[in-house]
């Protein structure tokens, strides 16, 4: 499901903590109406904030509807690594969020969404 740097684990980082800090969390309705705007919030990490420092930060997050890229948001260390996007869909799909940490690489999350 997600890229994971084994070398980092050998150096003492706990895999679970790394996942908690990196796997994006997609907050969106399970069901929406065709063609109607709704909000998708993405935050990086569950219950723990990822560092946003010059040497270690989330560089970007991308949102896909199946294989179609809906958005890409670039972050700087001055920002909080979360975003709210307003989108509309024409058919049911899997929303996927890919976030990229400059040290720990790419992490993915997915959420099924039904369009009526
Ligand atoms: Fe990281």
Give a label for each model feature:
Residues 37, 92-94:
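Extracellular Ig-like/FN3 beta-sandwich strand-entry sites
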Residues 32-45:
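Contiguous beta-strand segments within globular domains
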Residues 43-53:
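Short amphipathic, basic-aromatic surface patches that mediate peripheral association
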Residues 100-110:
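Short acidic/polar inter-strand loop motif in beta-rich domains
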Residues 81-85:
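Short strand-edge motifs at loop-to-beta-strand transitions and within beta-strands
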Residues 53-59:
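Short coil-to-beta strand junction motifs in C2/discoidin
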Residues 112-116:
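Short beta-strand edge segments in extracellular beta-sheet folds
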Residues 4-32:
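Short, compositionally biased P/S/T/A/G/V-rich stretches that sit at domain boundaries
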